[in-house]
Swiss-Prot record:
Signal peptide: none
Keyword Oxidoreductase included in the entry's annotation: yes
Family of this protein: Belongs to the MQO family.
Pathway(s) this gene product operates in, as recorded in its UniProt entry: Carbohydrate metabolism; tricarboxylic acid cycle; oxaloacetate from (S)-malate (quinone route): step 1/1
GO BP terms, alphabetized: tricarboxylic acid cycle
Lineage of producing organism: Bacteria, Pseudomonadati, Pseudomonadota, Gammaproteobacteria, Enterobacterales
Protein name listed in UniProt: Probable malate:quinone oxidoreductase
Enzyme Commission number, as recorded: 1.1.5.4
Claim: Iron-sulfur is one of the keywords in the record: no
């Protein structure tokens, strides 16, 4: 019966798309150089790059909702972290010999420096205005308890001192010092509990929705840019000349139109996978998606909000996925400070917060169903974790909060449903299918269509991700002197690494901090904390590395 239902649904969707395409033929076809599907931060960032690189190119952006930045980019639908691995412990895994690997942390930090430079450049151009409206200095802290976790954090701190990107980080195991950094976390805590924390002053809280709105508002000032809201893509068809005909439905009046584009970018968040599949390119067959939602506890009580100015990340329990890392964060949303705690995982078959319950079923195909099954079998701990999260009661969530805020009061907090994230499942020759952390740019061989899949670190690395896309689909142009000069004007460190170059790191941090109105003091010598001799890590089954 389930198979029949799925088949009938697929037929209905297919017939509807054919009907839409037929109706669209009767209307005049719109032509554009670049079609941006989705009104989120990825499309906005790519459009902003292309506006500087090729100002004469025409661009059309289509968004199914009534406004831009209303899904994952919306400030209330994500954690608002400027992910730079200053506090996220899952980016520094412990190796089997007990040492700490910092390669992933360095890569994440390098990527965020590109985002800072991109935003600073847009402020200087007048594209982004009033930096305080979208980015603010909020110290980033890691906080752990228990002897093993304290040893891990001490070793992590020592390992990160090898990189110029993490200079200025401080470490402490002293209750009084940590209380000064994060009073809300320490007040009411057992004074005998073994704790440790790191703190980096240059952490940030970012409103990605505000960045998106400002970037798109600037694009709209040009006559060769068109924004179409309440417009949903129903079909994509490759033409003989390698252009694309995209059928777009107007959700308000029920009409449809065809847009003929030389290049199509699918930056539709959770909906990107289904649209990529609709395109029919062979590269899409390697991917499936699994949706995971998130909830946060929110407090707007001034007694709580004014007592906490930091993003404080903990450590996932043994065997739990990194998505379970709790954090209690200062946020600045719509000009107002609030405190969020979470996330708590939720499950829905929707790929978007405003999506359809049929999303998961309609994206499941004969080519990706086996990789999905392999991932489910290989990640039973993850399945158990998700089930346990869905079963959490109000009291369970409050008890989790009290581990980070011992004196919390229930009446100060409310539960908020944040956005959906579609985790990448990719076909793997060895394992059948693997769950992937991060984002991936998937494109056809001709470089005429590209999609962004994945969830983390997401918006905080929009600028470097879109740079990767430019290099992948516009390789010849990227290597030209004109594009090289423009890209280096947008991102001064483009083409080189900051890690290992103290002077270059300090120069870029000083520049972006001044333009974006962020705090930055030149780092002093690192604390002389001894590096512990960690015990070799017991051999454990690899945990799926995914994140909300």
């Amino acid at each position: 019966m389930k198979k029949v239902t799925a088949m009938l649904f697929s037929m209905a969707v297919g017939l509807n798309a054919v009907s839409m395409a037929a109706k669209a033929k009767a209307s005049e076809e719109q032509e554009t150089d670049v079609l941006l599907i989705g009104g989120g931060i990825m499309s906005a960032t790519l459009g902003t790059y292309l506006r500087e690189l090729e100002p004469e190119w025409s661009m059309t952006m289509v968004e199914r909702l009534e406004g831009v930045a209303q899904e994952s980019s919306n400030g209330w639908n994500n954690a608002g972290t400027g992910h730079s691995a200053l506090m996220e412990l899952n980016y520094t895994p412990q190796n089997a010999d007990g040492s700490i690997s910092i390669e992933k942390a360095v890569a994440i930090n390098e990527a965020f420096q590109i985002s800072r430079q991109f935003w600073a450049h847009q402020v200087e151009r007048g594209v982004l205005r009033t930096p305080r409206s979208f980015i603010n200095t909020v110290p980033h802290m890691s906080f752990v308890w228990g002897e093993d976790n304290v040893n891990f954090l001490r070793a992590r701190y020592a390992a990160l001192q090898q990189s110029s990107l993490f200079r200025g980080m401080r470490y402490s195991e002293d209750h009084a010092q940590i209380k000064e950094w994060a009073p809300l976390v320490m007040e009411g805590r057992d004074p005998q509990q073994k704790v440790a924390a790191t703190r980096t002053e240059i952490g940030t809280d970012v409103n990605y929705g505000e960045i998106t709105r400002q970037l798109i508002a600037s694009l709209q000032k040009k006559s060769n840019f068109s924004l179409q809201l309440s417009s949903e893509v129903r079909a994509l068809k490759r033409n003989d000349d390698n252009t694309w005909t995209v059928t777009v439905a107007d959700l308000k009046n029920g009409t449809a139109q065809n847009i003929r584009a030389k290049f199509v970018f699918i930056g539709a968040g959770g909906a990107a996978l289904k649209l990529l599949q609709e395109s029919g390119i062979p590269e899409a067959k390697d991917y499936a998606g699994f949706p995971v939602g998130g909830q946060f506890l929110v407090s707007e009580n001034p007694d709580v909000v004014n007592h906490h100015l930091a993003k404080v990340y903990g450590k996932a329990s043994v065997g739990a996925p990194p998505m379970s890392v709790p954090h209690i964060d200062t946020r600045v949303l719509d000009g107002k400070r609030v405190v969020l705690f979470g996330p708590f995982a939720t499950f829905s078959t929707k790929f978007l917060k405003n999506g359809s319950l049929w999303d998961l079923m309609s994206s499941t195909t004969t080519s990706n169903v086996m990789p999905m099954m392999h991932v489910g079998l290989d990640n039973f701990d993850l399945v158990k974790y998700l089930v346990s999260q869905v079963m959490l009661s109000e009291e369970d969530r409050f008890e989790a909060l009290k581990e980070y805020y011992p004196q919390a009061k229930k009446e100060d907090w409310r539960l908020w449903q944040a956005g959906q994230r579609v985790q990448i499942i990719k076909r793997d020759a060895e394992k059948g299918g693997v769950l992937r952390l991060g984002t991936e740019v998937v494109s056809d061989q001709q470089g005429t269509i590209a999609a962004l899949l994945g969830a983390s670190p997401g918006a905080s690395t929009a600028a470097p991700i879109m740079l990767d896309l430019l290099e992948k689909v516009f390789g010849d142009r990227v290597s030209s002197p004109q594009w090289q000069a423009t890209l280096k004007a947008i991102v001064p460190s483009y083409g080189r690494k900051l890690n290992g170059d103290v002077a270059a790191t300090e120069r870029e941090l000083q520049y972006t901090s001044e333009v974006l109105g962020l705090k930055y003091d030149k780092p002093q010598a690192a604390d002389s904390t001894p590096k512990p001799q960690l015990k070799p890590k017991p051999v454990q089954k690899e945990v799926a590395d995914i994140a909300l």
